[in-house]
Amino acid sequence: MPVITLPDGSKREYDAPISVMGVAADIGPGLAKATLAGVVDGKEVDASFEITQDVSLSIITAKSEEGLEVIRHSTAHLLAQAVKQLFPEAQVTIGPVIEDGFYYDFAYSRAFTPEDLVVIEEKMKELAKADFDVTRRVLPRDEASAYFRGIGEEYKAQIIDSIPANEELSLYKQGDFEDLCRGPHVPSTGKLEYFKLMKVAGAYWRGDSNNEMLTRVYGTAWASKKDLKAYVHRLEEAEKRDHRKLGKKFDLFHIQEEAPGMVFWHPNGWSIYTAIEEYMREVQRLNGYEEIKTPQVVDRSLWERSGHWDKFRDNMFTVESESRDYAVKPMNCPCHVQVFNQGLKSYRDLPLRLAEFGCCHRNEASGTLQGLMRVRGFVQDDAHIFCSESMIQDEVSVFTDLLFKVYKDFGFEDVIIRLSTRPEQRVGSDEVWDKAEKALSDALDAKGLPWQLLPGEGAFYGPKIEFSLKDCLGRVWQCGTIQVDFSMPGRLDAQFVAEDGSRQVPVMLHRAILGSFERFIGILIEEYEGAFPAWLAPTQAVLLNITDNQAEYVKKVENSLKNKGFRVNSDLRNEKIGFKIREHTIQKVPYLLVVGDQEVENNSVAVRGRGGEDLGVMTVDAFTALLEEQISSKAR
């Protein structure tokens, strides 16, 4: 008879087989009520799963990530059940869990509308309230395929037909609706209380643009009303901060159909861009980087030698000229090796740090493009460090210090670090990988930095560390990376003369801090909601005259501040001062400098912050000192 070991090490012995729910009820009625599923010997199972032998068991409730996934997967089925009741001719396809929710794809004679979603959600609530038991049965593959074809679900049958013939498949039924799924699911639909349908989109069957277009319905589901409300609030905040809307509001950039995934930078946006570039150029110079510039279009032979032509060709823009094939570079690394290869290098030249604000182009699918966050043309703060194996740890350590300084200057201090180690398919010996992985982990440990291990997630050419930022809405953005590369230098004939006179292949460290400038600026726009710190703001201050009497003085001060390198403008329009203040406050200019007769007489300005705070009357020199301090300290 089964002996069940619980997570706290305690054991429970039973005289007969018992279900996961039965064990939960034996522990206590509160746990039984909260039980959604279980984990038996490491495998997730339904609450109805019968235990017949000695096992380890943990109960899944809504308080865990596993529980939340069960809720979301089950809610996707609830959505499909509601759609089938409301639109019987619709066919169901797939409905996976995604971050913060789920989606389900449907084949129907028309796309669903936002009005349809309201009706579908109400039907889902009705079905949840009915509290249908969710039951599981198993069928052989061919029998499952025949079953779904028999009820008119051709898409499900196609999915099943692609599964090996000897497989048994599980089906889950609730009320009159049955769907294919590996499970586990909640015990009954009454467990599904806190959900919301979010939007409708199009999706090709099996992700292939040659197939028919389906309707994808997105939803979210949570363990409590409080969690659902908080998520909806975050979405509303994200919508309010959407960089595409703010880009238009603050006249920063636009993207148009004639150049999909390519950015048209407006003066305000380009001001931010160049401020970031100048900042990165200076911090890299101070940290031993030498800036280079490499060609935009390169013969395919280099990409063949580097391995990119075989692995990345579909994502490359190519062109033919004079019977030669060229590619617009999708990354900078092969070109950086060409710079390294010019002239024989010695061990005394290492580490050699080559940096480029490299413009790259990748032929991303049009459906994946999203404002500045996913583009086809972008610039990276790209650099490659050529060094010996013994230098890896020190270089990673120095780079990490630089990365954290840069992130802090931009206002990000919550950084998630992940170390990805060797995959099954890789180049290089285990001994070399051991050294490289240890160098990366030791560099992080020496700084006392917390990090997560991702076994097997490294690139085929070497392990890597990825640095992700968490923004004010709790969203995570992977920006920085440092990757060890044992492959490319050798493929492209890079060598240096070692201390013993032998020729050796250097290790190459690929590294970036911001990643794509475009994406990083998109993150900044949303993080600051357009209220950029003074050092980044397109316009750092605006001078406002009260009457025409101050116009000459205002222009004089404007020119003086511009000559000091500040980004300032003047507003001499014949409008009431209150109107002008409101207009520039809406534009989130850091400082408004109001000038009346008294300010002219005293060679001063009345300073207002963008939040409406009165900073008092200052001499022009005093304001200059204030702005210089704000810029140099990277104050937020």
Swiss-Prot record:
It catalyses: tRNA(Thr) + L-threonine + ATP = L-threonyl-tRNA(Thr) + AMP + diphosphate + H(+). It is found in: Cytoplasm. PROSITE patterns: AA_TRNA_LIGASE_II (PS50862), TGS (PS51880). Signal peptide: none annotated. It is an enzyme of class 6 (ligase). SUPFAM superfamilies: Class II aaRS ABD-related (SSF52954), Class II aaRS and biotin synthetases (SSF55681), TGS-like (SSF81271), ThrRS/AlaRS common domain (SSF55186). One of its GO terms (molecular function) is metal ion binding. GO terms for biological process: threonyl-tRNA aminoacylation. Residues 242-533 are annotated as: Catalytic. Its EC number is 6.1.1.3. Residues 1-61 form the TGS domain. Its cofactor is Zn(2+). Zn(2+) binds at residues 333, 384, 510. Keywords: Aminoacyl-tRNA synthetase, ATP-binding, Cytoplasm, Ligase, Metal-binding, Nucleotide-binding, Protein biosynthesis, RNA-binding, tRNA-binding, Zinc. GO terms for cellular component: cytosol. Pfam families: HGTP_anticodon, TGS, tRNA-synt_2b, tRNA_SAD. Binds 1 zinc ion per subunit. Homodimer. Belongs to the class-II aminoacyl-tRNA synthetase family. Catalyzes the attachment of threonine to tRNA(Thr) in a two-step reaction: L-threonine is first activated by ATP to form Thr-AMP and then transferred to the acceptor end of tRNA(Thr). Also edits incorrectly charged L-seryl-tRNA(Thr). This is Threonine--tRNA ligase. The gene is thrS.
